[in-house]
């Protein structure tokens, strides 16, 4: 089986590494190198580093449409994307012999869009999962081929859930592709009446307005924004980023009072200071259904 892959962040790496071990990868597409250290140098994406590690041809165009002529004559059975980060034109979706597929971080049709994992946390969901779908011209609207559900416990933040979702996808992806290759699957048409969207979380939305949020909403916002850009509040004119918080007592935590109830922030960072991480023994990974 031959594959063309497209992905960018660390989320994609374990998934692609499993595929590299099992199948022939004709090329990998990723986002261009990005500035680091205040723009003085460029850094390759985690997926580009993976491609270089295995000496696989890698493309990193500003727009994927510009490499159409370079990839149109490649022979591959599947085009698989996982957190690539660009809209893919239909002429590229039509290139594989069998299908173009996408690994999406929600139980579709819930949370179509760029930030499904964060929105599951923001809304305090008790269940989420991975969907493997056909890619179509309409974003995240293709038929569902495979799913893996995950129970949420309310303690995990975006960092934890990205890691867990990536592990779940990497554990299943080889078997899923083999089953689809052998036509051992059934399709589920997405119910358009149940569609919800998950737009990218914006920096301007990261402010924790203590006087306007419920305790539950405060904690869920912290969970959702933990990865980037980080939820924050203002104390004595300075920004304090909060990455983990709970209503359970945590010794030496930074305490915030919301609606008359104490919230213990046990991973936080004051402006200009180092990040503080405190032990909280109730934190544990979620379970797979």
Swiss-Prot record:
An example molecular function term from Gene Ontology annotations: methionyl-tRNA formyltransferase activity
Catalysis: reaction(s): L-methionyl-tRNA(fMet) + (6R)-10-formyltetrahydrofolate = N-formyl-L-methionyl-tRNA(fMet) + (6S)-5,6,7,8-tetrahydrofolate + H(+)
EC class of the enzyme, as a word: transferase
PANTHER family given in the database record: METHIONYL-TRNA FORMYLTRANSFERASE, METHIONYL-TRNA FORMYLTRANSFERASE, MITOCHONDRIAL
Function in brief: Attaches a formyl group to the free amino group of methionyl-tRNA(fMet). The formyl group appears to play a dual role in the initiator identity of N-formylmethionyl-tRNA by promoting its recognition by IF2 and preventing the misappropriation of this tRNA by the elongation apparatus.
NCBIfam families: fmt
Name of the protein in its database record: Methionyl-tRNA formyltransferase
Taxonomic source organism: Mycoplasmopsis pulmonis (strain UAB CTIP)
Lineage of origin: Bacteria, Bacillati, Mycoplasmatota, Mycoplasmoidales, Metamycoplasmataceae
